[in-house]
From Swiss-Prot:
Its main location: cytoplasm. Residues 397-419 have a biased composition (Low complexity). One of its GO terms (biological process) is tRNA methylation. [4Fe-4S] cluster binds at C144, C148, C151. This is Probable dual-specificity RNA methyltransferase RlmN. It comes from Frankia alni (strain DSM 45986 / CECT 9034 / ACN14a). The keyword Lipoprotein does not apply.
Length: 419
């Protein structure tokens, strides 16, 4: 069985960026239906089909979205009749993700979880706690088909798209971890969600936009997060960017640009051969105009590749007078890559030139590098490569999730200004 990328302009070759068909082998049938995949009316129909009053679905939804109760914590669901809990939870909260490994660093303020889906696909999410907010970086695909050579995820290829519920589950888990004080810093509240984990979000357009609506909607419909705390990244799938502008979702759009010229960007971001810099930025400005939201321009600083002052000038020229902010990311190391992050002096020079040209610029305060949880490092690597392991239980014994068992600077992470 094959499946194609969910591009609104039709399938494209994510590895070369050329307009040909992209196929991948699915490991199994679609993930089980989960309440996060369903509208409120659809959930109520499920309850009625089980011989229960429709409002039982609302009760289950409130436990999940508002109380953040695990489906295996049936004793906490005292408003559900005991004989109805099993059928309702089996139908509305099936097992989707099982934690295969959990790693932490930054004095316990950063936690990466590797998840295994029911069909064996692997994905990762990262929770990061800052003094003024808590952010979760979620995956939208298992793997990635965009083929960017400096990104570990892209080098592993694409396994499949994630379902809406598989995306939402990563967020609900993060909210639960913070509420239950399982992360350093005491009890907290999830404030930001960034679609910057594994995968190209806009290549899984339908599931990602549905997940955004679930995250924004109030309980029992959804999690009730602020749309302004949500960020969707893209390497530049132009038709999907334009489509997103019309969705009525005032989320932040982050464009992974990495080069101001087509010659270099063709090498760094292969999809650029399909949609070059001018088209990507035109779609970004359209998004900013329609939504009123400032676009974040993501730019990985690679030593001797894209960090010269001439390219800073070229970037400033492209962004002059636009509703945009540049988020510079010192390249994070990935296995097999000879590229390195720009030296601090080079970073400062790049920032200085952009700021001299009037461009709002920050440098990401990278989190999670030592556990391969930083930007471009997510690859669901084997547990043996990890440096510090909090939990490395076998998948079979790990507690499943959902089982009847940004701020100034980068919206994704903390930022610092180099002076």
């Amino acid at each position: 069985m094959t499946a194609e990328s969910d591009s609104p302009d039709g399938p494209v070759s994510a590895g070369t960026g050329r307009p040909v068909r992209l196929s991948l082998t699915r490991r199994a049938a679609r993930p089980a239906r989960h309440l996060a995949d369903l509208s409120r009316d659809e959930r109520r129909q499920v309850a009625v089909a089980l011989g229960q009053p429709a409002f039982r679905a609302d009760q289950v939804s409130r436990h999940y979205f508002a109380r953040l109760v695990d489906a295996d914590e049936t004793d906490a669901m005292t408003d559900l009749p005991e004989n109805a809990r099993g059928p309702l939870l089996e139908a509305l909260l099936p097992r989707l993700l099982v934690p295969a490994r959990t790693l932490s660093c930054d004095d316990g303020l950063t936690r990466k979880t590797a998840w295994r889906t029911a069909d064996g696909a692997l994905l990762e999410s990262v929770i990061m706690r800052y003094p003024d907010r808590a952010t979760v970086c979620v995956s939208s695909q298992a793997g990635c088909g965009m083929g960017c050579p400096f990104c570990a995820t892209g080098q592993g290829g694409l396994t499949r798209n994630l379902s809406t519920a598989e995306i939402v589950e990563q967020v609900v888990h993060a909210a639960r971890v913070l509420r239950r004080q399982e992360l350093a810093g005491g009890q907290g509240r999830l404030s930001n969600v960034v679609f910057m984990g594994m995968g190209e979000p806009l290549a899984n357009y339908t599931a990602v936009t549905a997940a955004l609506r679930r995250l924004i909607a109030p309980s029992p419909e959804g999690l009730g997060l602020s749309a302004r705390g949500l960020t969707v990244s893209t390497v530049g799938l132009v038709p999907a960017m334009r489509r997103l502008a019309g969705e009525g979702l005032p989320v932040t759009l982050a464009v992974s640009l990495h080069a101001p010229d087509d010659e270099l960007r063709d090498e760094l971001v292969p999809i650029n051969t399909r949609w070059p810099v001018a088209e990507v930025l035109a779609a970004a400005w359209e998004y900013a105009e329609v939504t009123g939201r400032r676009v974040s321009i993501e730019y990985a600083l690679i030593d001797g590749v894209n960090d010269d002052v001439a390219r800073a000038d070229a970037l400033a020229t492209l962004l002059a007078g636009r509703l945009a902010h540049v988020n510079l990311i010192p390249l994070n190391p990935t296995e097999g890559s000879s590229w390195q992050a720009s030296a601090p002096a080079g970073q400062r020079a790049f920032v200085r030139r952009l700021r001299e040209r009037g461009i709002a610029t920050t440098v990401r305060d990278t989190r999670g590098r030592e556990i391969a949880a930083a930007c471009g490092q997510l690859a669901a690597e084997p547990a043996g490569r990890a440096r510090r392991v909090e939990s490395a239980r076998p998948v079979e014994s790990a507690r499943p999730v959902g089982v009847a068992g940004a701020a100034s600077g980068s919206p994704a992470h903390g930022s610092r200004v180099l002076r």
